[in-house]
A protein has these predicted regions:
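Mature catalytic domains of secreted/periplasmic carbohydrate-active enzymes
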Residues: 1-194
Length: 194
């Protein structure tokens, strides 16, 4: 058997760096439980360029970013979770930078790195909110599901931003909407892990 050209290219990437930075970092625990307070996150000197440069200098071709782990905390400002994400950290409120993932992506591009995302299907925060594992029925949903004052409404109405229909549970719709955000608003995402 011979690998396809795409498979051979993937093998040639060599090392993939894994960046797992989130709310659990500030609670000295491996996994969060969904009840952690984002306002505890207030680092000084956060330098995503330094992170990306370190990966590039180490010979990595791509960084896999944990954008949401099992605790449900997100490194970006999601329309679908407005409480347990980077926008609610003390550092975001102090600096006005509500989207750490966007900074990481920009730094990765600056240093020639591809970006992948790790998105955990488990979500302790949404379980506490009654969304994850609530045994809801699969009903047809439109993805993206526009929220109040959604900045994408014009693009959806004009057809510039595609939509699709899918039968999903409450959490399935939440997850699909977040993946839609991540895969349409951050440029080229090379790989997705669950």
């Amino acid at each position: 058997l011979r690998p396809t050209e795409g498979q051979a290219d993937y093998i040639d990437w060599g090392q993939i760096g894994f960046l797992h930075y989130g709310i659990n970092t500030y609670y000295n625990q491996e996994w969060g439980h969904g009840n952690e307070d984002p306002s505890r996150i207030d680092p000084t000197g956060l330098d995503t360029d330094q992170w990306a440069k370190s990966f590039a200098d180490g010979g990595f071709k791509m960084i896999m970013v944990t954008v949401k782990h099992h605790d449900g905390f997100e490194l970006y400002d999601s329309r679908y979770n407005t409480e347990h994400d980077w926008a609610n950290t003390a550092v975001a409120k102090r600096t006005g930078e509500k989207d750490l993932f966007r900074k990481i992506v920009a730094s990765a591009k600056k240093y020639g790195l591809k970006v992948g995302i790790y998105y955990s299907p488990a979500d302790s925060y949404m379980e506490r909110k009654g969304v994850w594992g609530n045994n809801s029925a699969r009903v047809e949903r439109t993805i993206p599901t526009l929220v109040e004052n959604d900045d994408r409404a014009g693009k959806v109405a004009s057809g510039k931003l595609p939509t699709f229909k899918y039968k999903a549970t409450d959490y399935g719709a939440y997850m699909l909407n977040q993946l839609y955000e991540l895969l349409t608003e951050y440029g080229d995402i090379s790989e997705v892990w669950f």
